[in-house]
Amino acid sequence: MKNRLTIGLLLAAIYLFWLLLSAPARLLALTLSDDARLAQTSGTLWQGEAHQASWRGVELAYLRWEFGFSTWLPGWHIRFNDPSGLRGQAWLHGLNEFVVREGRLVIPARLISQRLALGMPLEARGQLALTLPEASFNANGCRRIAASAVQWQDAALSSPAGLLELAQVNGKLSCTPAGALAVALTQDSHQLSLTGQGVLTPDGRYTFNGTLQPRQAAPALLTLLVAQNGRKDEQGRIPWRWQGEWLSEEKK
């Protein structure tokens, strides 16, 4: 009797383990927050893909995931390569407070400019490359970011005021005590010098505070517009403040 019970429990455990391993990928959608969505899924919880995914209004195609280990920690390795040019990969660990490791993200600059309430026709060129060795987030937003780097490569801005050619824009990400995402930027080209810090809150509001300094090679109309924005300091820099709300797909 005892042997039969042991065998029965063993078979039940094997069956449950098999059910867990073969759990369909669509169950993953049940664990996501309200601002995230997966559709047209295939595979399992442990290795699969979604042909449609979105997070806070950002749409992705062909999101793939695979369970594994990074630095001896269990987690999911995700990667995506959207037709828009947005692509990236990272390791995700944890549930309530998740940790991002070995994150790399490439974003066409035009995608970001389309999400900002600029108030004037402005086309951003180039691409942003983000490296995120380690970061942690929870329901309240950003908790910690270590040794990050942001680079705007082949940077340029096209507007009715003229074409503004930028040097490579360098930045560093951090978290504010309130859980917002902050980025410190520097850029110095033959047309414009720019320094400042931007903040993006969990509810999608952003602000940027910094200084601008047009160079001699800057378009004349742009120099005039910048000069009207404020008074120069003793080094010729003009204060610049910019704020707005990150536009969802519906508001674009």
Swiss-Prot record:
Q: Which GO terms describe its cellular component?
A: plasma membrane; type II protein secretion system complex
Q: Which ranges sit in the Periplasmic compartment?
A: 26-252
List the residue ranges forming a coiled coil, or say none: none
Give the residue spans that cross the bilayer: 5-25
Main localization (coarse): membrane
The segments annotated as topological domain Cytoplasmic are 1-4
Report the domain of life of the source organism: Bacteria
Query: Where, subcellularly, is it found?
Result: Cell inner membrane
**What UniProt keywords are attached to this protein's entry?**
Cell inner membrane, Cell membrane, Membrane, Protein transport, Transmembrane, Transmembrane helix, Transport
Task: Please provide the Gene Ontology terms (biological process) for this protein.
Answer: protein secretion by the type II secretion system
Q: Which InterPro entries match?
A: T2SS_GspN_CS (IPR000645), T2SS_protein-GspN (IPR022792)
Protein family: Belongs to the GSP N family.
Q: What's the stated role of this polypeptide? A: Involved in a type II secretion system (T2SS, formerly general secretion pathway, GSP) for the export of proteins. Required for the translocation of pullulanase.
UniProt protein name = Type II secretion system protein N
